[in-house]
Amino acid sequence: MLLQKTLCIVKPDGVRRGLIGDVVSRFERVGLKMVAAKMLIVDESLAKKHYLYDDIVFRHSEAVWNSLIKFISNSPVFTFVVEGVESIEVVRKLCGATEPKLAIPGTIRGDFSYHSFKYSNEKGFSIYNVIHASANEADAMREIPIWFKDNEILNYKRDDECEHYYC
């Protein structure tokens, strides 16, 4: 069984719009288990640990990195870890395409956001796409310890766990 943990962050635009409950319920309804959660105001140092300069600049640009740091810094976010069978892929599917205009209806981004990269770049701000989710297992393993200590990640059983994990 490929049981994984992955990091999710309801970004400032999602928090300001009151979407935390809507986002979390999408994951819980499919059987993913929340094993850690916290709401906090992100300082610039934490933002820079999460959004690695070299990675973002290589894939996008320095302007995109700067806008990400500015967007998430000094703003409230709700960050959480979910666990489940192949949870990284499941979470990415439920989130939808990173660029909201490409996200299909029924996904978090498809239902709650609509901006495009072009519009965001022209305006000089980060894309408002409600949620961050680890892209792959390596990212999840790097990101989770940035946001959570080991003792903040819980191990418990949901009542319906055997329905999802074939106990």
Swiss-Prot record:
Belongs to the NDK family. It holds the Pfam family NDK. Keywords: ATP-binding, Cytoplasm, Kinase, Magnesium, Metal-binding, Nucleotide metabolism, Nucleotide-binding, Phosphoprotein, Transferase. It is found in: Cytoplasm. ATP binds at K11, R92, T98, R109, N129. Its main location: cytoplasm. This is Nucleoside diphosphate kinase. It catalyses: a 2'-deoxyribonucleoside 5'-diphosphate + ATP = a 2'-deoxyribonucleoside 5'-triphosphate + ADP; a ribonucleoside 5'-diphosphate + ATP = a ribonucleoside 5'-triphosphate + ADP. One of its GO terms (cellular component) is cytosol. The active site is at H132 (pros-phosphohistidine intermediate). Major role in the synthesis of nucleoside triphosphates other than ATP. The ATP gamma phosphate is transferred to the NDP beta phosphate via a ping-pong mechanism, using a phosphorylated active-site intermediate. GO terms for molecular function: ATP binding; metal ion binding; nucleoside diphosphate kinase activity.
